[in-house]
């Protein structure tokens, strides 16, 4: 089938955008299936001969290909003002998205009051806050699950929308007290936004099935990552949607048999943003080195990312659930200067190995992490263009990961530039 899926395999920020950008050069439709504008992909591409940096949050980053159509699927939650702010910013930089960006009529809506509530919930949690982006994503998905949310199609029946919207806000007042919010002003604002949004709205299920059955190449761009999945991540320090291969099917309305390839994106070390367990975290000079050399600051929030060694327990868990056909190992160049590199291989409790990745966070907080130490290569790989030219120890690191996961690494990121990606031919 003509559907390729790119998914994050750790806690997000793996660098999915660059691979999507490369693959999007040869595809017809780039689709998002879950999440909202809490995601963050940065892509550097030439526009009219000038390198430009584009920050994507809600919109599919495959739009950098001027021949590619973007689709925001029904599994997303959409803050309409942010949708237009991002679209306007891209077009101001010279990226014309006219007649090639569409949004599902079934996608749920995020409102400003969701963002206010998101902040109030974090304050309420105090020292146990999750560390959300405060974009209102969680409260919007909560409304969806409780069947009280509003969807894109509701915008086009203004009287019904206004009635439902007032009830939604009143419900939040009852839960959180009366916070400052102009309900009637918002209703009027969305009346105008609805008319601007109308040309972008489609039946996304019919749209994507027509694309697939007519032979178009479809690329699905996953947001966040497996370890932030609502079911399989480090709950409750997770996002509020399905970030797995299953979320692709439910968020776009396509069956599993239509998916041809699933590519997992793996950072050469591990990072995460916000609270939650992180067994391989390095609160030492190594952690600082990875943070500084890797420029580990969030695209969406600007927050510093926590850093640690590559964790194979996490990746085995991720690979079992998503069934990767191949991997993209990113930011390998960040390890260039290190004389030795550690990889987390097992979690132990009282000397006994845990069989999988534990659901119990108290248990997870008390695991002993077993590491394997590999020799570094201590030379720059940034200008290398073929796999054979990589240093032997670098290839050894790659092979160790492949052998441990039984999944081939097909793409290797060797620098921040768009061209800094080495393709390794897979054995048939």
Curated annotation (Swiss-Prot):
Mg(2+) binds at residues 13, 40. SUPFAM superfamilies: P-loop containing nucleoside triphosphate hydrolases (SSF52540). The lineage of its organism: Eukaryota, Fungi, Dikarya, Basidiomycota, Agaricomycotina. Keywords: Cytoplasm, GTP-binding, Ligase, Magnesium, Metal-binding, Nucleotide-binding, Purine biosynthesis. One of its GO terms (molecular function) is GTP binding. Substrate binds at residues 299-305. Pathway: Purine metabolism; AMP biosynthesis via de novo pathway; AMP from IMP: step 1/2. GO terms for biological process: 'de novo' AMP biosynthetic process; IMP metabolic process. Pfam families: Adenylsucc_synt. Homodimer. Its EC number is 6.3.4.4. It catalyses: IMP + L-aspartate + GTP = N(6)-(1,2-dicarboxyethyl)-AMP + GDP + phosphate + 2 H(+). GTP binds at residues 12-18, 40-42, 305, 331-333, 413-415. IMP binds at residues 13-16, 38-41, 133, 147, 224, 239, 303. It comes from Laccaria bicolor (strain S238N-H82 / ATCC MYA-4686) (Bicoloured deceiver). Gene3D superfamilies: Adenylosuccinate Synthetase, subunit A, domain 1, Adenylosuccinate Synthetase, subunit A, domain 2, Adenylosuccinate Synthetase, subunit A, domain 3. This is Adenylosuccinate synthetase 1. It is found in: Cytoplasm. InterPro entries: Adenylosuccin_syn_GTP-bd, Adenylosuccin_syn_Lys_AS, Adenylosuccinate_synth_dom1, Adenylosuccinate_synth_dom2, Adenylosuccinate_synth_dom3, Adenylosuccinate_synthetase, P-loop_NTPase. Plays an important role in the de novo pathway and in the salvage pathway of purine nucleotide biosynthesis. Catalyzes the first committed step in the biosynthesis of AMP from IMP. SMART domains: Adenylsucc_synt (SM00788). One of its GO terms (cellular component) is cytoplasm. Belongs to the adenylosuccinate synthetase family. PANTHER family: ADENYLOSUCCINATE SYNTHETASE. Its main location: cytoplasm.
């Amino acid at each position: 089938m003509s559907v390729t899926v790119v998914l994050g395999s750790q806690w997000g920020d793996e660098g999915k955008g660059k691979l999507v950008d490369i693959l999007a050069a040869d595809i017809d439709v780039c689709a998002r299936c879950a999440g909202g504008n809490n995601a963050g992909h940065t892509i550097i591409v030439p526009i009219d001969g000038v390198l430009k940096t584009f920050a994507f949050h809600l919109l599919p980053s495959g739009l950098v290909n001027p021949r590619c159509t973007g689709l925001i699927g029904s599994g997303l939650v959409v803050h309409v003002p942010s949708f237009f702010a991002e679209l306007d910013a891209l077009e101001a930089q010279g990226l014309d998205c006219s007649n090639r960006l569409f949004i599902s009529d079934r996608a749920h809506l995020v409102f400003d009051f969701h963002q206010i509530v998101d902040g109030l919930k974090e304050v309420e949690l105090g020292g146990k806050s999750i560390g959300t982006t405060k974009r209102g994503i969680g409260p919007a998905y909560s409304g969806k699950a409780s069947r009280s949310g509003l969807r894109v199609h509701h915008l086009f029946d203004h009287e019904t929308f206004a009635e439902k919207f007032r009830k939604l806000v009143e419900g939040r007042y009852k839960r959180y007290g009366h916070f400052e919010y102009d309900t009637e002003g918002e209703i009027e604002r969305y009346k105008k936004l609805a008319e601007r949004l109308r040309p972008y709205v489609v039946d996304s299920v019919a749209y994507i099935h027509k694309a697939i059955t007519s032979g178009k190449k479809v690329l699905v761009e996953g947001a966040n990552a497996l370890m932030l999945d609502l079911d399989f991540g480090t709950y409750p320090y997770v996002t509020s949607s399905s970030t797995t291969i299953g979320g692709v099917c439910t968020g776009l309305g396509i069956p599993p048999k239509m998916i041809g390839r699933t590519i997992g994106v793996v950072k050469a070390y591990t990072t995460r943003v916000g609270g939650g367990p992180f067994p391989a975290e390095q609160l030492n000079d190594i952690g600082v080195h990875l943070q500084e050399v890797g420029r580990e600051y969030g695209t969406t929030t600007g927050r510093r990312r926590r850093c640690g060694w590559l964790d194979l327990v996490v990746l085995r868990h991720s690979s079992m659930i998503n069934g990767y056909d191949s991997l993209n190992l990113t930011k390998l160049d960040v390890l260039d200067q290190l004389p030795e590199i550690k990889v987390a291989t097992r979690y132990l409790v009282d000397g006994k190995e845990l069989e999988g990745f534990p659901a119990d966070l108290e248990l997870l907080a008390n695991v002993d992490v077993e590491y394997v130490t590999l020799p570094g290569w201590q030379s720059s790989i940034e200008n290398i263009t073929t796999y054979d030219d990589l240093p032997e120890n670098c290839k050894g690191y790659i092979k160790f990961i492949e052998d441990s996961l039984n999944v081939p690494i097909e793409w290797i990121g060797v620098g921040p530039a768009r061209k800094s990606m080495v393709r390794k031919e897979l054995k048939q």
